[in-house]
């Protein structure tokens, strides 16, 4: 019981740790006109103004959270963080967004821009295309005025207050 209590206390701080991780994206991966944090804020702002639900807004905010620690598998890392809090659909989209995003740039560096077609039979294929088209590939604009992180903090705190999906089979 003692360790469970300590773990519960630790888990209550998850939103703060996630916000700190988002802030760290402000100084990651040079070469772009904007930071990864600004990129994430642009996507979340666009989703907010488009009327997307909170789950998608949060998924967009955190879709690149793995860039610093898992540059070769950032999509999977972001999806793993979100998994207890999002639907299977959103989990799948975030997990595969890196492959879907390749459509916009892979052909410039010898990659396969159509790699996403491996997933054409997924029920969420078109949703992943929309995610990348509307809230990822177009969110590197140095002139776009995104909402600040502070705008999203109450949403983050609420969303990550407790897992929505904690059945063991959902976490395997």
Question: Positions of the model-derived regions?
Answer:
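Metal-dependent phosphohydrolase cores
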Residues: 1-61, 65-172
């Amino acid at each position: 019981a003692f360790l469970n209590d300590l773990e519960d206390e630790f888990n209550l701080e998850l939103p703060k740790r996630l916000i700190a991780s988002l802030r760290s994206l402000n100084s990651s991966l040079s070469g772009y006109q904007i930071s990864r944090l600004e990129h994430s804020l642009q996507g979340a702002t666009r989703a907010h103004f488009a009327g997307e639900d909170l789950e998608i807004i949060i998924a967009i905010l955190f879709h690149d959270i793995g860039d610093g620690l898992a540059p070769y598998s950032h999509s999977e890392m972001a999806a793993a963080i979100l998994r207890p809090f999002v639907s299977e659909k959103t989990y799948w989209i975030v997990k595969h967004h890196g492959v879907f995003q390749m459509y916009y740039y892979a052909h410039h560096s010898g990659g396969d821009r159509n790699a996403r077609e491996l997933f054409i039979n997924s029920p969420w294929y078109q949703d992943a295309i929309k995610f990348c088209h509307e809230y990822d590939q177009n969110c590197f604009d140095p002139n776009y005025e995104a909402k600040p992180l502070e705008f999203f903090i109450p949403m983050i705190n609420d969303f990550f207050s407790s897992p929505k999906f904690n059945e063991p089979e959902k976490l395997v």
